[in-house]
Amino acid sequence: MSDDGLVSAAASPEERAFEAGLRPRTLAEFVGQRKVREQLTIMLEGARARGRPPDHVLLSGPPGLGKTSLAMIMAQELEVPLRMTSGPAIERAGDLVAILTALSPGEVLFLDEIHRIARPAEELLYAAMEDFRVDVILGKGPGATAIPLDVSPFTLVGATTRSGLLTGPLRDRFGFTAHLDFYDADELARVLTRSAGLLGVTLTAEGAAEVAGRSRGTPRIANRLLRRVRDYAEVRADGVVTREIAQAALRIYDVDGLGLDRLDRAVLEALVTRFGGGPVGLTTLAVSVGEEPETVEDVAEPFLLRAGLLIRTARGRMATPAAFEHLGLDPVTDPLGRTQVSLFTEGE
């Protein structure tokens, strides 16, 4: 993964394989998402007491917050197999039929990016979720015949980063829905402390807090930064990750105190220094930093918006006072009401 992707919440296949060794195995080990954990605990205990699979579960929220981990934990707690697939992998209804008819009783089926499932497959899923059967259509036109196939009772765990793209009929068939929120710094520090123990890394409390503060509220990013800081500590120091070591390491990787990377800061600096804080159009802003508009909109803007550094208006993008402050610049308003910038001086 390139340095520019160091604070991206997306994960490569190699990183997902590495994450497997850090994933919690039980709800008690899972850090953060307190309400969701409590609700899932009650639901799973009730299902075990009844001897039946729990309701279908829909988990929504940004990537890297633990949706896959929770699906794995559910199967572990229920002591049943887990089968994993994704919406893009199911291109035809037949693909889904093959998966559903192969499920064992009580099995947990994890369907990542469920909002991207093909419509014919989605419609087939309705009956499977409600009645544990699928209707296979043989032939075409008036002579087509529907053959019902039984499906073993199962629990579907759907995960989505874009719940607004789910159709109403699909969303309504989930008995339990939960939204995963970003983590606070204390929760991320606990995640880092646990991961450091599993990786054999000596991490001080101050070092954990420093990495947590730059992790954008996302455990996946926190663990990724921890690995880079560990490398620095082993090569340039005595192997102990302190606050100073974390700061020095992340300075090399261009991750600043808020978790902004090179692209984030380039966008923010262009908006503030070249366009006086805005408003400026997306295309113009993207050209000024040598990127495509889609890259700026999809990669840089979401965190800048969430961090309160940028706002979108009908006239274009604008920097907030917090953006000027973060860059060490002082917003100055001239008599015409236009915002200009000047560097802070030591005498101010």
UniProtKB/Swiss-Prot annotation:
Transmembrane segments annotated in the record for this chain: none
GO cellular component: cytoplasm; Holliday junction resolvase complex
Known EC number: 3.6.4.-
Positions annotated to bind DNA: R312, R317
Compartment(s) where it occurs, according to its Swiss-Prot or TrEMBL record: Cytoplasm
Similarity-based family: Belongs to the RuvB family.
The protein's role, per its UniProt record: The RuvA-RuvB-RuvC complex processes Holliday junction (HJ) DNA during genetic recombination and DNA repair, while the RuvA-RuvB complex plays an important role in the rescue of blocked DNA replication forks via replication fork reversal (RFR). RuvA specifically binds to HJ cruciform DNA, conferring on it an open structure. The RuvB hexamer acts as an ATP-dependent pump, pulling dsDNA into and through the RuvAB complex. RuvB forms 2 homohexamers on either side of HJ DNA bound by 1 or 2 RuvA tetramers; 4 subunits per hexamer contact DNA at a time.
Record's protein name: Holliday junction branch migration complex subunit RuvB
Gene transcribed to yield this protein: ruvB
